[in-house]
């Protein structure tokens, strides 16, 4: 018995066990079907369950915004202001580029006009 145990221990020490590690997480949602239907990848990111209030008053009073609704609204407002700011900067950069291009062209024309002056008998004809 002791001899068998020693053999088992010796053989287990020399053999190495290989372990595979999965590097990608499995997708629980069929993404191809959702893309074909025009739906977002995450069904909880957008839709009536996330955008509409949880309840309504029967007398028609507006329902207060939920915490996540308020957070999403504030985030969307920040994104909108950032878009307006960046589009203004882009328009300014376009105008500046056109202005610099026109200035460079006029400077080039001025240099050409100053270099090419009539000389000799062409100067006397005027």
Curated annotation (Swiss-Prot):
One of its GO terms (biological process) is mitochondrial translation. The keyword rRNA-binding does not apply. Signal peptide: none annotated. GO terms for cellular component: mitochondrial large ribosomal subunit. Belongs to the mitochondrion-specific ribosomal protein mL52 family. PANTHER family: 39S RIBOSOMAL PROTEIN L52, MITOCHONDRIAL, LARGE RIBOSOMAL SUBUNIT PROTEIN ML52. Component of the mitochondrial ribosome large subunit (39S) which comprises a 16S rRNA and about 50 distinct proteins. This is Large ribosomal subunit protein mL52.
């Amino acid at each position: 018995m002791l001899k068998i145990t020693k053999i088992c221990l010796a053989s287990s020490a020399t053999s190495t066990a290989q372990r595979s590690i999965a590097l990608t997480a499995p997708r629980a949602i069929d993404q191809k079907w959702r893309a074909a239907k025009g739906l977002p990848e995450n069904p909880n990111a957008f839709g009536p369950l996330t955008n509409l209030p949880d309840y309504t008053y029967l007398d028609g009073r507006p329902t207060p915004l939920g915490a996540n609704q308020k957070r999403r609204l504030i985030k969307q407002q920040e994104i909108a202001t950032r878009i307006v700011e960046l589009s203004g900067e882009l328009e300014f950069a376009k105008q500046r580029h056109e202005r610099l291009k026109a200035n460079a062209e006029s400077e080039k024309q001025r240099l050409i006009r100053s270099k090419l002056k009539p000389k000799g008998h062409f100067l006397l004809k005027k």
